[in-house]
C-alpha cells in the first residue's frame, strides 16, 4: 500500500496547487486566468470575464479574435516554459478592449505538467507609478518574517533581495547573475526563506504570498532590484 499512498499523496498535492491558485485569483483585483500546456483555459476569474468576454464567447474564441495578442502571448508562454533563467515574463502595452495592459505570464509546475498564470494590470498604472495611488498593505506577519530573515546571522545581507526575486518566480541562475552571488548561495537563502514561511517549495511560497495580497509590493521590489543592477 505504501507506493500507492505516495502516488495518492502526490496527486492530492497537485490538485491542491491548482485549487489553491484558482481560489486565490478568483478574488484578485485584476483580470487573471490559468491555462494548461495545450492552451486550454482552465480557469478565468470574474474580472477576466467582465473585462474581456461576452456572454456567449469562450476564452478560447476570444483569444483567437485577438490576432496580434494571440501570437505575442503564445510566444511569451513558450519562453516562460523553456527559459531556464526565469519563469516570469512581462508583456507590456497590449491594447485590448480600448485599454493598454501589462500582462505578467508565470509558469507553475503542477506535477509533471506546467500551468500558466496570466495577470492583467492597467499599463498606465504600471508605467506611471508616481501618479498611481496603489494601496499596498503588508500584513504584520509578513513584515515580521522579513525582519527575522534580515536578522538571521546564518545568511548574507542579500537574503531579502533573494526573497523578492525568488518569490516572483525567477530562477537561481538569474538571481545569482543579478545579485552577483553564487547559485549555491541563492539556493541556501531560498531554502531558509521557505523554512521561515513554512512551505516546501517555490510554488507554495508564491501561492501563500498571493493569498496574503502581497503580490503588488513583491513585484515592485523585484523590478526595483532588477532595474538598479
Curated annotation (Swiss-Prot):
One of its GO terms (biological process) is regulation of DNA-templated transcription. The keyword Cytoplasm applies. GO terms for cellular component: cytoplasm. It is found in: Cytoplasm. SUPFAM superfamilies: C-terminal effector domain of the bipartite response regulators (SSF46894). Keywords: Activator, Conjugation, Cytoplasm, Plasmid, Transcription, Transcription regulation. Its main location: cytoplasm. It comes from the Bacteria. One of its GO terms (molecular function) is DNA binding. This protein is essential for positively regulating the expression of transfer genes that are involved in the conjugal transfer of DNA between bacterial cells. NCBIfam families: PRK13719.1-4. This is Protein TraJ.
Amino acid at each position: 500500500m505504501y507506493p500507492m499512498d505516495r502516488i495518492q499523496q502526490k496527486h492530492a498535492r497537485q490538485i491542491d496547487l491548482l485549487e489553491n491558485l484558482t481560489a486565490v485569483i478568483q478574488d484578485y483585483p485584476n483580470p487573471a486566468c490559468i491555462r494548461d500546456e495545450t492552451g486550454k483555459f482552465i480557469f478565468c476569474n470574474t474580472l477576466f470575464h467582465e473585462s474581456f468576454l461576452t456572454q456567449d464567447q469562450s476564452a478560447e474564441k476570444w483569444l483567437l479574435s485577438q490576432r496580434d495578442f494571440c501570437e505575442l502571448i503564445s510566444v511569451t508562454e513558450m519562453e516562460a516554459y523553456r527559459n531556464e533563467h526565469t519563469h516570469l515574463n512581462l508583456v507590456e502595452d497590449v491594447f485590448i478592449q480600448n485599454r493598454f495592459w501589462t500582462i505578467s505570464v508565470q509558469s507553475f509546475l503542477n506535477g509533471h505538467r506546467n500551468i500558466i498564470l496570466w495577470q492583467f494590470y492597467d499599463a498606465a498604472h504600471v508605467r506611471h507609478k508616481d501618479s498611481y495611488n496603489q494601496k499596498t498593505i503588508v500584513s504584520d506577519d509578513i513584515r515580521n518574517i522579513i525582519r527575522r530573515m534580515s536578522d538571521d546571522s546564518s545568511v548574507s545581507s542579500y537574503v531579502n533581495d533573494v526573497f523578492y526575486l525568488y518569490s516572483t518566480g525567477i530562477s537561481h541562475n538569474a538571481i545569482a547573475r543579478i545579485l552577483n552571488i553564487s547559485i549555491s548561495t541563492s539556493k541556501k537563502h531560498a531554502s531558509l526563506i521557505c523554512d521561515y514561511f513554512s512551505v516546501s517549495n517555490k510554488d507554495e511560497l508564491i501561492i501563500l504570498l498571493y493569498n496574503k495580497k502581497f503580490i503588488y509590493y513583491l513585484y515592485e521590489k523585484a523590478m526595483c532590484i532588477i532595474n538598479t543592477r
